[in-house]
């Protein structure tokens, strides 16, 4: 199967099904506040990667990962039946670090804004390092440099 549109539709359907199963069928107390953010499936529809985020600290993320691993078989069975494919895709759950990347980029942008403000503040008090006009504007004396020498060199 190499139809990208069909693969995309199946990936979206896997995301919806996994979110539904996690919300309604998994009763594991280790499962935290989870959001299924994305799903990707291979072109042969055999392997699916499901991305999720968890609200909480590292321990909540670890316990949610353990809960998803223990419920992986039941989730795969439900997804396989709902998709109606010959083979149920193998599910791999991956913690989505988009929120961490967004925070890191926001921090970098804040640092850049702070540095720009500092440069702007220093520029308002800036003075010339030398004179205001560094190039000398002297009038040239008469007969210097404007005359063209006669052809053949200097004739005396």
From Swiss-Prot:
GO terms for biological process: maturation of SSU-rRNA. GO terms for molecular function: ribosomal small subunit binding. GO terms for cellular component: cytosol. Pfam families: RBFA. It is found in: Cytoplasm. Keywords: Cytoplasm, Ribosome biogenesis. It comes from the Bacteria. The keyword Signal does not apply. Residues 124-156 are annotated as: Disordered. PROSITE patterns: RBFA. InterPro entries: KH_dom-like_a/b, RbfA, RbfA_dom_sf, Ribosome-bd_factorA_CS. Transmembrane segments: none annotated. Monomer. Binds 30S ribosomal subunits, but not 50S ribosomal subunits or 70S ribosomes. One of several proteins that assist in the late maturation steps of the functional core of the 30S ribosomal subunit. Associates with free 30S ribosomal subunits (but not with 30S subunits that are part of 70S ribosomes or polysomes). Required for efficient processing of 16S rRNA. May interact with the 5'-terminal helix region of 16S rRNA. Belongs to the RbfA family. This is Ribosome-binding factor A. It comes from Salinispora tropica (strain ATCC BAA-916 / DSM 44818 / JCM 13857 / NBRC 105044 / CNB-440). The gene is rbfA.
């Amino acid at each position: 199967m190499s139809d990208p549109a069909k693969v995309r539709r199946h990936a979206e359907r896997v995301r919806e099904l996994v979110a539904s199963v996690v919300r309604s069928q998994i009763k594991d107390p280790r499962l935290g506040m989870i959001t299924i953010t994305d799903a990707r499936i291979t072109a042969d529809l055999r392997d699916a990667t499901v991305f999720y985020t968890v609200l909480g600290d590292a321990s909540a993320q670890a316990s949610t990962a353990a809960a998803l691993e223990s419920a992986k078989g039941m989730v795969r069975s439900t997804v396989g039946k709902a998709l109606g494919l010959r083979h149920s895709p193998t599910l791999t759950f991956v913690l989505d670090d988009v929120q961490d990347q967004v925070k890191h980029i926001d921090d970098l942008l804040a640092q850049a804004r702070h540095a720009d403000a500092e440069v702007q503040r220093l520029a308002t008090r800036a003075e010339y390092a030398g004179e205001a006009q560094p190039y000398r504007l002297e009038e040239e004396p008469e007969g210097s440099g404007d005359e063209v020498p006669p052809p053949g060199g200097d004739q005396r």
